[in-house]
Structure formats: C-alpha cells, structure tokens
From Swiss-Prot:
Organism: Caenorhabditis elegans
Reactions accelerated catalytically: S-(2-aminoethyl)-L-cysteine + acetyl-CoA = S-(2-acetamidoethyl)-L-cysteine + CoA + H(+); O-(2-aminoethyl)-L-serine + acetyl-CoA = O-(2-acetamidoethyl)-L-serine + CoA + H(+); S-(2-aminoethyl)-homocysteine + acetyl-CoA = S-(2-acetamidoethyl)-homocysteine + CoA + H(+)
Oligomeric and partner information: Homodimer.
GO molecular function: N-acetyltransferase activity
Domain of life: Eukaryota
Domain N-acetyltransferase: 4-159
Cross-referenced Pfam families: Acetyltransf_1
Protein name as it appears in the record: Thialysine N-epsilon-acetyltransferase
Family recorded in the similarity comment: Belongs to the acetyltransferase family.
Enzyme class: transferase
Binding site for acetyl-CoA: 84-86, 92-97, 123-126, 130-133
Length: 160
C-alpha cells in the first residue's frame, strides 16, 4: 500500500475539494446538481459550516471526507458525513475506511454519540464498506425517510 497523509481541510484546500466534489457527483450520476464553487466552499470552510479530512499520496489529493455538525434534540450534537470519496486510482488501498475511521475518532474524542450519512442504493462498494461496522439502516429499521427542498421550493413555500 502506498503511504498517504491525512490532514484536516483548510480553506486552501477548496480547489482540490471542489474538483473531487465534481468527480463524486459525476460518479453518482448527478454532475449537473453541483452549483457550489471553490470560492463558496472556501468561505464555508472558513465559517466552519463544513469540516473534513483530505488524504494525500505525495502531493496528489487522493480522497476526502467532508462532514458537518448537526443537532438532535434527542441526543445533542452529532456529525453528518456528507461526502466520503476516493479517486478511482487510489481505491482498494484502505483509504476510505481510514478517512471514515478518522471521523469516528473525532466523534468519540468529542463525546459525540451519533454519526449519520446517506448512500445511494446502487453504490454496492460503499455499502460493502459500511457493512464492515455496526450501524442502523434507519429506512429499514425505523421507517425514516429523508426529504429535501431546493432553493426554488424554499422560496415558493416562504412566499405563500
């Protein structure tokens, strides 16, 4: 296995991260959905709206784990893993699990007792990775569905 270095993301990583975000969106067959920019991401990192880890092999960014802090009235603060992505040429090296574990270690060290994420039902490799640890599929076990409003829907609702 090649040696890699994992660092906490900073605003200076925004260009590298947005590039991987576009790659992930293309992989997920949702490329046209990405409207974020490197500059907006840079500001969001500065403002602590998003956090993460970026893995490097040499000078080349190999993968990322982006997350944010959320809040549950039942358990308090928790972490939502937004994007766990490894570039194709760096897959099957244990990097995804290492980046994911880094987030679990952060949660443990901060006393955070919940880590949530979503995965597309056809992404069998990601699901196989997640199946290596204990978790609960909330759709199956508790019947939770996740819903989303886009900007147009928000404006329409707010303007009613």
């Amino acid at each position: 296995m090649k040696n890699f270095e994992i660092v906490t993301v900073t605003p200076d990583h925004a260009e590298q991260l947005i590039s991987m975000i576009h790659e992930l969106a293309e992989f997920e067959k949702m490329k046209s959905s990405v409207v974020n920019t490197a500059e907006k991401l840079r500001k969001d990192i500065e403002n602590k709206a998003v956090h993460g880890f970026i893995a490097f092999i040499g000078e080349e960014p190999a993968g990322m784990n982006l997350f944010y802090y959320a809040y549950s009235t039942w358990v308090g603060q928790y972490l939502h893993m937004e994007d766990l992505y490894i570039r194709p040429q760096f897959r099957r090296m244990g990097l995804a699990r290492t980046l994911w574990k880094k987030l679990a270690e952060l949660a443990r060290d901060k006393g955070i007792v919940r880590l949530e994420w979503a995965v597309l039902d056809w992404n069998k490799n990601a699901i196989a990775l997640y199946d290596t640890v204990d978790y609960v599929n909330l759709t199956k076990s508790e019947g939770w569905f996740t819903f989303r409003m886009d900007g147009a829907a928000i404006n329409k609702f707010a303007d009613e």
